[in-house]
């Protein structure tokens, strides 16, 4: 499951957009 990196990036992006 190499989606951990994507999830981290997505979470970071979400926080930035907030």
From Swiss-Prot:
One of the record's GO molecular function terms: rRNA binding
Keyword line: Ribonucleoprotein, Ribosomal protein, RNA-binding, rRNA-binding
One GO cellular component term noted in the UniProt record for this chain: ribosome
Superkingdom as given in the UniProt entry: Bacteria
Similarity annotation: Belongs to the universal ribosomal protein uL24 family.
Assembly with partners or alone: Part of the 50S ribosomal subunit.
Role according to the record: One of two assembly initiator proteins, it binds directly to the 5'-end of the 23S rRNA, where it nucleates assembly of the 50S subunit.
Protein's recorded name: Large ribosomal subunit protein uL24
Annotated organism of origin: Serratia marcescens
Lineage: Bacteria, Pseudomonadati, Pseudomonadota, Gammaproteobacteria, Enterobacterales
Gene: rplX
